[in-house]
Amino acid sequence: VSLTDEEIRLIQHIWSNVNVVEITAKALERVFYVYPWTTRLFTSFNHNFKASDKQVHDHAVNVSNAISAAIGDLHDINKNFSALSTKHQKKLGVDTSNFMLLGQAFLVELAALEKDKFTPQYHKAALKLFEVVTEALSCQYH
């Protein structure tokens, strides 16, 4: 998956106009409730999976920082996510399908937040972003 310059511009515009930690926390909460098996990776959260819970918020900060860094350098994302991919594979044992589940949850949250501003062009660009992120986070699995 590759992004056009226009899609990168749209992604940067979307990301700069939302509270990235808040939307990430909401996306994480959605994943935890819609796909409950994903919570097995977060036993330290003590079954507190709401966006407002401290552990979810703290993880949202980490995730949003990683996505923000990716958006800042989309042309070299595999290199930039190499260590994170290794951590998710070897240390945490994360199934790569979970990355796309989070991406889909982001799309829902962005659409709910942006409403009419979340045009088909924005949707396509955001979807491709999360496909690129998923590929990058999965690069050390192969």
From Swiss-Prot:
PROSITE patterns: GLOBIN. GO terms for cellular component: blood microparticle; haptoglobin-hemoglobin complex; hemoglobin complex. GO terms for molecular function: haptoglobin binding; heme binding; metal ion binding; organic acid binding; oxygen binding; oxygen carrier activity; peroxidase activity. One of its GO terms (biological process) is hydrogen peroxide catabolic process. Heterotetramer of two alpha chains and two beta chains. Keywords: Heme, Iron, Metal-binding, Oxygen transport, Transport. Involved in oxygen transport from the lung to the various peripheral tissues. It comes from the Eukaryota. Heme b binds at H59, H88. Red blood cells. Belongs to the globin family. This is Hemoglobin subunit beta-1. Residues 2-142 form the Globin domain. The lineage of its organism: Eukaryota, Metazoa, Chordata, Craniata, Vertebrata.
